[in-house]
Amino acid sequence: MSEREKITIENIVASTSLAEHLDLSRIALALDGSEYEPEQFPGLIYRLQDPKTAVLIFRSGKVNCTGAKNIEDVKRTIKIIIDKLKAANIEVYDDPDIIVQNIVAVYDLESELNLTDIAMSLGLENVEYEPEQFPGLVYRVEEPRVVLLLFGSGKVVCTGAKEESEIEQAVIKVKKELQKVGLI
């Protein structure tokens, strides 16, 4: 099993722009089940069941999609929103650029970790480890630019990636560094 196959994507956050300006009150009527309370939050919230995602739509035309487990679900979500808005005669772009903002993934090193030893070996300039504050070790990888949270159980959470390949690179990198110093 490759490293990529052992990585589980938990959440992809992506953004796009559907128009220069959107009338959220009108969209709230067009999207059944949407939540729009401008006195509470400036955006409209719309949750989909398939794929199981949520979108935040703003007056500026900006849209954030969250909850996707893969990029195809992000694309499907945006397409569904576009189709529903067009069906309600709301003008939106046909094929907007989608920008991945963050990918959160988990990985299991399949070995218990001594986080104190790891904190010393990875170098204090890239590591935060305060077990009284948080049970995980925060490791800021410089290339690719992601953050890994390492836990004593061997579980690793990766955040800050823009592409799936960055997660795989970071996992391979930390595994090599820990193997080099005999910590896994």
From Swiss-Prot:
GO terms for molecular function: DNA binding; DNA-binding transcription factor activity. One of its GO terms (biological process) is DNA-templated transcription initiation. Sequence repeats lie at residues 9-85, 100-178. CDD domains: TBP_archaea. PROSITE patterns: TFIID. Keywords: DNA-binding, Repeat, Transcription, Transcription regulation. SUPFAM superfamilies: TATA-box binding protein-like (SSF55945). General factor that plays a role in the activation of archaeal genes transcribed by RNA polymerase. Binds specifically to the TATA box promoter element which lies close to the position of transcription initiation. PANTHER family: TATA-BOX BINDING PROTEIN. Belongs to the TBP family. This is TATA-box-binding protein. It comes from Thermoplasma volcanium (strain ATCC 51530 / DSM 4299 / JCM 9571 / NBRC 15438 / GSS1). The lineage of its organism: Archaea, Methanobacteriati, Thermoplasmatota, Thermoplasmata, Thermoplasmatales. The gene is tbp.
